[in-house]
C-alpha cells in the first residue's frame, strides 16, 4: 500500500484522499458535525454558497441551511458564520445543512474529488479516526493532501499530515514517498501541536486577527471520532461536495 503526502493539492488521486486544512476548514467541518449538522456542502465560491440558500431551504424546510466561511480569515458578508471551530463548537446544528466556502480547504476538497474514489476530511482533532477510516477504505493508495495557504505550503498542514502518517505507519504495510518523509520529519522535529500551529505563518495571522482560540482548539489531537466523508446522490446541488459523518 502506498502512502503519499502532497504538500499542496496536485490531483491525479486514484484511491483514498485525506484532505487537511487544520487552520481552519477541516477542523471546523468536524466541529459542525460534532454539533449535530446533518451534512456539509462545500462550494468552490462564495457566490455558489449564497445562491444555494433559497434552493436548499425550499427543498427541505426541516433541514434549514446555514452558511459558514471566510476570506482572508474573516467571515464572508452574507454568511451566517465564519470559519471558526470555536464558534461552531458553541452552536447547535442539529437538523441543519452547513454550506462551507473557505480560502483554501474547500478548493482542496474539490481538487481531490476530481479523481479520488473516497474523500475524507481530516484535522488534528480527528486525526486517528481519519487514519483508521482511510486504512479501512484503501486498496492501493492513501494520499494525504495539505490544503496550504494561498497556494503556499503551510507548516500546520504538513505537521498534521505527519501525525496521520505516523499513525498509519504504526498500522503497517505501507511504502512512503518523499512528501510523507517530509511530513514525518516535521512531526518529529517541530514540537507539540500548539507550538507547531501557533508558530506557523497562518497561525500567527489568526492570532493577529484575535482568533488565537481557534489555533488552540485546532491543536487538540484526536478529541473526535467523526470523519467527514464525501457522499453522492441526486440531492447534492450542482457545484457542491456533500460530506456526512462517517
Swiss-Prot record:
UniProt keyword annotation of Hydrolase present: yes
Pfam families referenced in this protein's UniProt entry, alphabetically: 2-ph_phosp (PF04029)
InterPro entries hit by this protein: ComB-like, ComB-like_sf
The protein, known as: Probable 2-phosphosulfolactate phosphatase
Organism lineage string: Bacteria, Thermotogati, Deinococcota, Deinococci, Deinococcales
UniProt-recorded Gene Ontology molecular function terms: 2-phosphosulfolactate phosphatase activity; magnesium ion binding; sulfopyruvate decarboxylase activity
Gene source species: Deinococcus deserti (strain DSM 17065 / CIP 109153 / LMG 22923 / VCD115)
TM regions (residue ranges): none
Cofactor: Mg(2+)
HAMAP family, per database record: ComB
EC number(s) given by UniProt: 3.1.3.71
Catalytic EC class: hydrolase
Reaction catalyzed: (2R)-O-phospho-3-sulfolactate + H2O = (2R)-3-sulfolactate + phosphate
Keyword Iron: no
Protein family (similarity comment): Belongs to the ComB family.
Keywords carried by this UniProt record: Hydrolase, Magnesium
